[in-house]
Curated annotation (Swiss-Prot):
Interacts with US3 kinase. Interacts with UL31 and UL34; these interactions seem important for efficient virion nuclear egress. Interacts with UL41/VHS. Residues 1-206 are annotated as: Disordered. This is Tegument protein UL47 homolog. GO terms for cellular component: host cell cytoplasm; host cell nucleus; viral tegument. It comes from Equine herpesvirus 4 (strain 1942) (EHV-4). Tegument protein that can bind to various RNA transcripts. Plays a role in the attenuation of selective viral and cellular mRNA degradation by modulating the activity of host shutoff RNase UL41/VHS. Also plays a role in the primary envelopment of virions in the perinuclear space, probably by interacting with two nuclear egress proteins UL31 and UL34. Expressed in late in the infection. Keywords: Glycoprotein, Host cytoplasm, Host nucleus, Late protein, Transcription, Transcription regulation, Virion, Virion tegument. GO terms for biological process: regulation of DNA-templated transcription. Residues 31-41 have a biased composition (Polar residues). Coiled coil: none annotated. A motif (Nuclear localization signal) lies at residues 13-33.
């Protein structure tokens, strides 16, 4: 009978039908049309482990390979009718009974490394200033030609929606945007695959990646191995994933990038400012400024103590043997021309010739060859920096090792300022995987022995960011002017909320002609630029690039990169998907760091805005540039900003923040990271002011690029920190109070910095963490570690760097941070920009209800998402 009817007794043999998209992209989550480096890989817990990747509504596992698997094996009896007949008429011996599996929640992770050997080791009254309460040119400008005649007509929404300053509807307008073209049709995909299979040419971009043909074959082998329950399916799946990632991660042939600004950004740039709008400024800003410090004598009377610098930074500077710029850099201009490096960056192609550009920004020295000895010395300087946890940190690893595989336990320890050593070393490997290895693998595969492409990207993206600052500052001015308008003439609500407190201030048109634009610039869209802006700002880890900027920029970039890496290691060592929450003290410190870090990023971007205009100007000694030319502000206030000075006093003098700073290891790491950035940026800006008047133009250019490298890493760190906090609020149900203007400010700055950094959404971030943990063979586990893995690293005393960093008092009243609001509720207005536009509508309701906000607010948040207006 078997011979006549086949092994299934006549039952039809048919595989479940899958779409062309699913067959071509098995590691892409359903519904995702764009595969980024952080999107999930085919339900990593199920499909990639060989189990069924979906469940029936009743809770039974759906065996999608029943027809093929059971037909080839007699050891797994079928429960179908044909299977019953087959067992009745078959002479085969019945299958041996199998012992029931232990429950997953009580079973230890498979192949968990024992760390019993770890037990043997030891855990090591003032006059108020109005300098920044108003715009830089207060009382010296007026809004001209701002009539609303000739405005474009917008569709009036037919539904009611909130219009409060918190709503931030423009962040959700993507739901009403024009639908993206659907994925390729089946015939188109077949034609594409046929073409690829016949394509045997070498990849022209010298990426040395395997062609798509190998990926197609590997996917088919993986499908066959999973269908037959082959024992080598896990190895085939892992190799297929590696091939897939090489194609569809940033830099891969299949990685697609958006070529034009999103419709949300288009709406944002048009809401509140029109083609006929312009800013007319009056005053003496076009006069030569012989003494920029003369405008800041009132600061000397108001602030009695200079800005405090990190003691560890001062020690680093004092121990450094070469803190000055080396004028005898050896490079051949003819060789650079032959290598096509001495050319104008793409942002100014057609506007400035190469000779004119490099006269204004003399940066050709950054293309000089960095020897292997110099690069090794720079990497060793990073590794030799003393970390809070006492272990060595790497900036350019060849591979990730020296961690325990198996369970990862992130629960709080009994000791104050303590952390599990097992989790810490696992977090060090995970941080390298998330933030560093993507760049190192790209550089290795492309055989980029030099840093030239990174320098070109850095200067190009930095100038594009300055152009976005030009646009954003004007949008905010007109948002303030039209804040009382209604209907389609009303600007976006986040712009209105920020317009009265922003530090992005407009420059006179006469000194910023090269920065003028009317739409947001999203930057270059090449494979290399995709890598350089991904992975939370990875360029600071590249030793050759840091060394190319020369001191004093190089040493400050290294100092910032190291301490922000430490902060992220502690963040990863304290939470994962099985335990996404933090302690109350840790959340207080995280909120304070996020609020101050976002404000500091805004101050730094305004500095980039003014410095870019100054470097590109034919006369860099004008009064319009006094904010970057004067040295007094940077000697008295952090980053030369009274607003940041007052915000630090307001936040850091809070008793809850002071307790959190001293009582938890994570809080100390976060604040040390913040003050490291604040110290390094202040030092670079101060050195820039000292050099710009008659000093070395090469040093000025190096400091400008160094500030850009630091703020890329700072913005990536803020993205990292925000996703950890948002996960604790929405996934962990923690009730977190956050300043109401932090998220609007963060979202606007993320749009401004789009040429430099690719923002990662909450959903993508947590999926990427789980994916990377699986690749590292680490399993998130709730609770404390088991016996033999309970070694604690504890800092005996609070860090000496932190107590003296808080300013002694405020200069003005109020720092423009907003009132305290619930984070879980506030996040619902930022579905596209923060949570992720591919998130389900239920994301966050669990956090709202667990944090005590209630069902009513959860339903209101869902209503706001559903009825976001198209016009904003």
């Amino acid at each position: 009978m078997d011979q006549h009817h086949g092994v299934r007794g006549g039952a039809p043999i048919r595989r479940p039908r899958r779409s062309i998209e699913t067959r071509s992209h098995p590691f892409r989550a359903a519904g995702n049309t764009q595969r980024t480096y952080s999107t999930p890989r085919l339900s990593y817990r199920d499909g990639l482990s060989g189990r069924a990747s979906s469940l029936e509504p009743g809770g039974q596992a759906h065996d999608q390979n029943e027809s093929s698997t059971q037909s080839t094996s007699n050891n797994q009896p079928s429960t179908s009718f044909w299977g019953y007949l087959r067992r009745v008429f078959s002479d085969d011996a019945p299958a041996q009974p199998q012992a029931p599996r232990s429950r997953a929640d009580f079973a230890p992770p498979p192949e968990e490394d024992s760390s019993s050997e770890e037990e043997d080791e030891e855990g090591p009254s003032q006059a108020p200033l109005d300098e920044e309460d108003q715009l830089m040119y207060a009382d010296q400008y007026s809004v001209g030609n701002s009539s609303d005649d000739n405005e474009e007509d917008y569709l009036q929404p037919e539904v009611e929606y909130p219009t409060s300053a918190e709503s931030g509807e423009y962040h959700n307008s993507g739901m009403f945007a024009e639908e993206e073209p659907e994925s390729e049709s089946e015939s188109d995909m077949e034609n594409y695959e046929t073409y690829e299979e016949n394509d045997t040419e070498v990849i022209s971009d010298d990426s040395h990646r395997l062609t798509r043909t190998w990926l197609d074959r590997s996917i088919r082998l993986m499908d066959d191995a999973l269908a037959q329950s082959s024992e080598i399916s896990k190895a085939i799946t892992k190799s297929t994933r590696r091939l897939y990632d090489s194609q569809f991660t940033p830099g891969g042939r299949g990685y697609k990038q958006t070529e034009t600004p999103s419709q949300r950004l288009v709406h944002l740039s048009r809401a509140g400012m029109y083609d006929s709008d312009e800013i007319v400024m009056t005053g003496d800003y076009m006069e030569v400024d012989d003494d920029p410090n003369s405008a800041y004598q009132s600061w000397v009377r108001a602030i009695h103590h200079p800005v405090a610098m990190n003691p560890s930074w001062e020690e680093t500077i004092s121990n450094h043997t070469n803190t000055s710029f080396s004028a005898d850099i050896d490079y051949d201009i003819d060789e650079l021309i032959e290598m096509n490096l001495a050319r104008t960056p793409p942002v100014f192609e057609g506007l400035l010739d190469s000779a004119d550009f490099f006269y204004r920004l003399p940066m050709l020295y950054t293309y000089a060859t960095i020897t292997q000895d110099e690069a090794y010395e720079e990497r060793q300087a990073w590794s030799n920096t003393q970390a809070l946890h006492g272990h060595e940190q790497s900036s350019w690893p060849a591979l990730v090792s020296d961690y325990s595989k198996g369970g990862m336990y992130v629960s709080p320890t009994q000791e104050p300022r303590g952390i599990w050593r097992r989790a810490l070393k696992q977090a060090m490997a995970l941080q390298l995987k998330l933030c560093v290895l993507g760049l190192t693998e790209f550089v290795t595969k492309r055989e980029l022995t030099q840093h030239h492409s990174a320098v070109t990207f850095l200067v190009d993206s930095l100038l594009r960011t300055a152009k976005n600052c030009y646009l954003a500052s004007r949008l905010l001015v007109f948002a303030w002017e039209r804040r009382r308008e209604t209907g389609v003439r009303r600007p976006a609500e986040p712009l209105i909320a920020l317009s009265g407190v922003t530090l992005l201030q407009p420059l006179p048109p006469e000194v910023s002609e090269l920065l003028e634009q009317r739409t947001f610039d999203i930057g270059l869209r090449t494979p290399q630029s995709g890598v350089f802006r991904a992975f939370f700002g990875p360029l600071v880890y590249w030793a050759e690039l840091r060394r190319a900027l020369r001191d004093p920029a190089a040493i400050n970039c290294r100092y910032v990169g190291f301490h922000l890496q430490t902060s992220e290691i502690y963040l990863l060592a304290r939470a994962h998907s099985a335990s996404p929450g933090y302690t109350k003290e840790e959340l207080v410190a995280m909120e304070a760091t996020l609020t101050l870090g976002t404000l500091m990023l805004e101050v730094a971007l305004q500095w980039i805005h003014v410095a870019s205009a100054q470097l590109l100007s034919e006369n860099d000694a004008l009064k319009a540039f006094r904010r970057v030319s004067a040295s007094i502000p940077h000697a008295l206030a952090p980053l030369g900003s009274i607003r940041l000075h007052d915000a630090e006093f307001e936040v850091l003098s809070n008793p809850d923040v002071m307790v959190a700073r001293d009582e938890t290891a994570l809080s100390q790491a976060l604040f040390l990271g913040y003050f490291s950035v604040r110290t390094a940026l202040t030092a670079c800006m101060r050195d820039y002011a000292n050099e710009v008047d008659g000093g070395s133009k090469e040093t000025v250019t190096g400091l400008f690029l160094g500030v850009g490298l630091i703020i890329q890493r700072l913005a990536g760190h803020m993205n990292f920190l925000l996703n950890c906090m948002a996960g604790a609020a929405l996934y962990g149900g923690s009730k977190i109070a956050i300043h109401s203007l932090t998220l609007p400010r963060y979202s606007l700055l993320a749009d401004v910095m789009a040429p430099m950094l690719q923002q990662q959404s909450l959903v993508d971030f947590w999926r990427a963490r789980d994916d990377m943990l699986e690749e590292l063979e680490i399993t998130p586990r709730p609770g404390p570690p088991t016996q033999g893995k309970r070694v604690v690293l504890e800092m005996p005393l609070p860090s000496d760097d932190l107590p003296a960093m808080t300013p002694s008092g405020q200069v003005n009243n109020g720092a423009g941070l907003g009132r305290m609001v619930d984070m879980a509720k506030h996040l619902q207005h930022y579905r596209e920009t923060i949570i992720g536009d591919d998130a389900s509508s239920s994301v966050g309701k669990r956090g709202l209800m667990k944090s005590g906000v209630g069902v009513r607010h959860a339903l209101e948040a869902e209503k706001v998402i559903r009825y976001s207006p198209k016009s904003t």
